[in-house]
From Swiss-Prot:
S-S bridge residues: C33-C59, C86-C107, C154-C181, C208-C231, C297-C364, C301-C367, C312-C415
Subunit structure, as described in the record: Interacts with heparin with high affinity, and type I or II collagen.
Cell division found in the keyword field: no
Expression sites (tissue/organ): Highly expressed in the heart, trabecular meshwork, pituitary gland, bladder, mammary gland, trachea and placenta and weakly expressed in the brain. Expressed in cartilage.
PANTHER family associated with the record: OVOCHYMASE-RELATED, PROCOLLAGEN C-ENDOPEPTIDASE ENHANCER 2
SUPFAM superfamilies recorded: Spermadhesin, CUB domain, TIMP-like
Source organism of the structure: Homo sapiens
Domain of life: Eukaryota
Gene that encodes it: PCOLCE2
Domain NTR: 297-415
InterPro entries (alphabetical): CUB_dom, Netrin_domain, Netrin_module_non-TIMP, NTR_PCOLCE, Sperma_CUB_dom_sf, TIMP-like_OB-fold
Protein name: Procollagen C-endopeptidase enhancer 2
Positions glycosylated per UniProt: N355
Length: 415
């Protein structure tokens, strides 16, 4: 049963929206399913707001503010079907007009802080299923200068020579659940970006699966260019960009929260040496990892021994499907969707719902050879950064169902 006290703020907000619209039209605003919105400011709302929104709908609003400005979106009211993972009825907010860089997903009555795009476009999408419904949502968008109170917003474009960024509610309260913030830092072409976290407290997890901060070289979320993924209460070591752009992504799930963080950046001349770290989580110390050498990669590419014989000498053992591969610096970097994990060790495992994956580095890019879309049994070592390390003598073979019984038996083996 929805609380009657929700109607008081709802009515006040509707009255405010009505008053604003009367400056242009004497009629009360009518909220429809999606639309194209341009200008300095305006309101969007679920279809029929403040009435109950219809079932089985998908509505998309595309917002554009003047060039050179960013979009700031403030939810004034939200009442959607509640679910811990927002699987049924939800509102998604995207950077730009495509389903690429999602800033956040929201449901229930949780009202997030201000959401900011990195450019002059933002997309809002609401999806409802066939069952429980609520009164929907109403939000106000406005145009702002890229740096206007930038450290108070959740994300945005940062292009001044120095500045700060912090989690919503910092330092007064814990950051809210269910938020994604994306800060895009852009320096002049001939400069680099140095990044430091002053205070840092994000929900701890061995693999940073729930709440985390990820830092990327460039201007987009791209796992191949990820510098690090961080959680816990130890500030990451200072980071220096490879070029003139960094992207910082903060994500909190819908459960535990923590104090949050504040970080600072400064531009510096490109001529200084850089010390960009390899991808890490705060659970593990920083490492440069193994590098391919002529001597190492001239070894015979041939596995030796058996499944049983290699089990105890391997840090991790898994069966999985290779889903992405990229060659960089003479090594192959692969993402493997895990079918089953038999020995985990310190391997960093990412989890999205029921799907688990791990990132592996084949130090010599073609030895052993991994092909995208194929299933393998993979045994290897784990670097200090949590990535699997596959050497020329690592034990890898095609995964077949008949191997399952033996692997299950090895899982209980005492080494």
């Amino acid at each position: 049963m929805r609380g009657a006290n929700a109607w008081a703020p709802l009515c006040l907000l509707l009255a405010a929206a009505t008053q604003l619209s009367r400056q242009q039209s004497p009629e009360r605003p009518v909220f429809t399913c999606g639309g194209i919105l341009t200008g300095e400011s305006g309101f969007i709302g679920s279809e029929g707001f403040p009435g109950v929104y219809p079932p089985n709908s998908k509505c998309t609003w595309k917002i554009t503010v003047p060039e050179g400005k960013v979009v700031v979106l403030n939810f004034r009211f939200i009442d959607l079907e509640s679910d811990n993972l927002c699987r049924y009825d939800f509102v998604d907010v995207y950077n730009g007009h495509a389903n690429g860089q999602r800033i956040g997903r929201f449901c229930g009555t949780f009202r997030p802080g201000a959401l900011v795009s990195s450019g002059n476009k933002m997309m809002v999408q609401m999806i409802s299923d066939a069952n429980t419904a609520g009164n929907g949502f109403m939000a106000m968008f406005s145009a702002a200068e890229p740096n206007e109170r930038g450290d108070q917003y959740c994300g945005g474009l940062l292009d001044r020579p120095s500045g700060s960024f912090k989690t919503p509610n910092w330092p007064d309260r814990d950051y809210p659940a269910g938020v994604t913030c994306v800060w895009h830092i852009v320096a002049p072409k001939n400069q680099l970006i140095e990044l430091k976290f002053e205070k840092f407290d994000v929900e701890r997890d061995n693999y940073c699966r729930y709440d985390y901060v990820a830092v990327f070289n460039g201007g987009e979320v791209n796992d191949a260019r990820r510098i690090g993924k961080y959680c816990g209460d130890s500030p990451p070591a200072p980071i220096v960009s490879e070029r003139n752009e960094l992207l910082i992504q903060f994500l909190s799930d819908l459960s535990l929260t923590a104090d949050g963080f504040i970080g600072h950046y400064i531009f510096r001349p490109k001529k200084l040496p850089t010390t960009t770290e390899q991808p890490v989580t705060t659970t593990f110390p920083v490492t440069t990892g193994l590098k391919p050498t002529v001597a190492l990669c001239q070894q015979k590419c041939r596995r030796t021994g058996t499944l049983e014989g290699n089990y105890c000498s391997s840090d991790f053992v898994l069966a999985g499907t290779v889903i992405t591969t990229i060659t960089r610096d003479g090594s192959l970097h692969a993402t493997v969707s895990i079918i089953n994990i038999y020995k985990e060790g310190n391997l960093a495992i990412q989890q999205a719902g029921k799907n688990m994956s791990a990132r592996l580095t084949v130090v010599c890019k073609q030895c052993p050879l991994l092909r995208r879309g194929l299933n393998y049994i993979i045994m290897g070592q784990v670097g200090e950064d949590g990535r699997g390390k596959i050497m020329p003598n690592s034990f890898i073979m095609m995964f077949k169902t008949k191997n399952q019984k033996l692997l299950d038996a090895l899982k209980n083996k005492q080494c």
